[in-house]
Amino acid sequence: MQSKMSVMTVLPKGKHTATIIFSHGLGDSAAGWYPFAQALAPRFKHVKWVLPTAPIQPVTLNGGMPMNSWFDIRTLTPTNSSQEDERGLLASVRTISDLVAAEVDAGIPANRIVVGGFSQGAVVSLAVGATLERKLAGLISLSGFLILADKIKSMQVDHAPSYPVFWGHGTGDPVVRYQWGEMSVQKLREVGWKNIQFESYPGMQHTLGAKEQQDVEAWLKKILPGEQ
């Protein structure tokens, strides 16, 4: 069950003109990605970072153990949507969409907001981008994958395929296999997503690598430039 969500923020050092909402992976929390946001913040003085923590709920993959999770996961292999927690995913999509709405209400245009995440958080971020009526600046998927793949074409809003997407994945990932990442990108391309920058990192496992962080920074500089 979704409960009140805790959020960590890294405030901009300059005038706030853009926001990045970044969601963690299974069993993690906002605190796990706070150093990532802090590391990039000095290069993006106009950006506010919003780091939500998922609610605690039982996870089938881990024997029903309760942990921070955006939705239930039954398996970490590609499957059909009948085996996937569509209800849980869409509940988390609403949660992240509410964070987007809060930023818009505070004066940040949707096209100056990037939504991204790692692993399970990336899944939610992709689903937010696919379904949100507001058009965002772009999406980030780190070690992510696509669920409800057989429904994505019917679920997505008209502008979703135009999104710039940064997608990074390690070839040595033992949790979310690199091939699943490739398959997910291919599925999105099949339904019209043509602006996906897919970067592979030889030998990298289920983590954030230094080169990947540099690539995310370079991509963000193009997508969320500061005031000239």
Task: Locate the predicted segments by residue.
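C-terminal catalytic histidine-bearing segment of alpha/beta-hydrolase fold enzymes
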Residues: 182-228
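Primarily recognizes the serine-hydrolase "nucleophile elbow" in alpha/beta-hydrolase
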Residues: 104-158
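Short, conserved loop/helix-junction motifs that constitute active-site signature segments
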Residues: 41-44, 155-162
